[in-house]
Design a protein with these regions (language model features):
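AMP-dependent adenylate-forming
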Residues: 1-11, 41, 155-158, 173-383
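Motif- and composition-driven signal specific to adenylation
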Residues: 3-205, 212-221, 247-248, 271-272, ...
Length: 383
């Protein structure tokens, strides 16, 4: 410490200067270090973003390595609000309830996986909150309905945005009618400091046309720490509406409706090839998620030799059926899926779990599921 300077270095700082390094969640591989600038934060929270417009008292539970830390810290503080830190290593539904009662917490951010888990464990734990922000993954429509019915006075915002766009690129305050949208809960319109482009062959797709979701604006990161080639690939400069525009390519697929609302359709890079067929795991997830007795599910490719894939594996958490009976066992679930899906999409491995694994940032950990297939003979006890 004695060797360190005692005065400010006097380096010039502007909106593009690095402010923090955040890490991606690593749900499908190794976390990447993302360099985020000052304007990425200030443009979002100084721009009248609705959940932070009234000096909220917000739960601050995200680790500082994740951009959720920025949301929970600067969101309230730059708007005259307060941060409340929970005691203990893990946030539990009872802790959230206690913080609302004791410390006046009125706003909280939970990943979709944690939001679902809290609703399953204790649907009343959100009592006293005026606003809940969630997202990062596809929301469960039945759980959203449960929240809206039990907490009609509370706002529920679905936020979408990779770490590379600093917290959110779009957001939508969910309304009951959103639960009836065929493609799932919409992910909204751009938040302050961001623009969204749905591109097909690097051209803007029209309303209702599927394309890759790309983001531009002040919210973009400078790039990946010490990885210039990846930065160049994921943050290209394209000509959009006649202007050269730096964008972040999310790899997600979606479309904008006639009102400009963005709808998420899935990942564009999860496609795998199995026995000559190109397969979208999300198609299987959507079919399983629509069945009575399936609470959560995830589909991952079964690792084969030489980086090939031998088939699909479905992991799910069972729920009670509408008539109160137990949810399907793996064999019954696979039989049902076989009546709904083409043969090459029917998972060869089906496993029931009490809970699906989560990363440190609270998102579904697909890598852990794949690793479990590598650790054990995936034919033992499976279909």
């Amino acid at each position: 410490m004695a060797d360190r300077a005692t005065r400010r270095p006097g380096l010039p700082v502007d909106g593009s200067s690095p402010a923090a390094v955040f890490f991606t969640s690593g749900t499908t591989g190794r976390p990447r270090a993302v360099v985020s600038g000052h304007s990425a934060t200030t443009s979002l929270f100084c721009g009248g973003f609705e959940p932070f417009a009234s000096a909220p008292t917000m739960l601050q539970a995200a680790p500082p390595t994740w951009d959720g830390f920025t949301l929970e810290t600067w969101g309230p503080l730059v708007n005259g609000g307060t941060c409340v830190l929970p005691e203990g290593e893990y946030l539990l539904p009872g802790v959230l309830r206690e913080l609302a009662d004791r410390d006046g917490v009125d706003t909280a951010w939970l990943t979709a996986s944690l939001f679902h888990l809290f609703l399953d464990e204790d649907p009343g734990c959100f009592q006293g909150l005026s606003h809940v922000l969630t997202g990062g993954e596809r929301l469960s429509v039945p759980r959203v309905r449960t929240f809206l019915e039990r907490h009609p006075a509370a706002g529920l915002t679905n936020g979408y945005g990779p770490v590379e766009t600093c917290v959110f690129a779009t957001a939508r305050r969910i309304r009951p009618a959103d639960c009836d949208v065929p493609t799932g809960i919409p992910i909204g319109v751009p938040v302050p400091g961001r623009r969204v482009h749905v591109l097909s062959e690097d051209r803007e797709a029209g309303p209702g046309t599927t394309g890759e979701i790309c983001v531009s604006g002040e919210g973009l990161a400078a790039g990946y720490l010490d990885d210039d080639p990846l930065t160049t690939r994921r943050f290209p400069t394209l000509t959009i509406d006649g202007a050269r525009t730096r964008v972040y390519r999310t790899g997600d697929l979606g479309f904008q409706d006639a009102d400009g609302v963005l709808h998420f359709l899935g990942r564009g890079d999860r496609q795998v090839k199995i026995r000559g067929h190109r397969v979208e795991p999300e198609e299987v997830e959507a079919a399983a998620r629509g069945l009575s007795g399936v609470r959560e599910c995830a589909v991952v490719p079964v690792p084969g030799k030489n980086e090939s894939h031998e088939g699909l594996a479905l992991f799910y958490t069972p729920a009670k059926n509408a008539d109160g009976s137990d949810g399907p066992d793996p064999k019954a679930l696979r039989r049902t899926l076989a009546t709904l899906l083409p043969r090459h999409l029917v998972p060869g491995v089906v496993r029931s779990r009490d809970r699906l694994p989560l990363t440190a940032s609270g998102k579904l950990d697909r890598t852990a599921l794949t690793d479990s297939l590598r650790r054990h003979d995936h034919t033992e006890g499976d279909l």
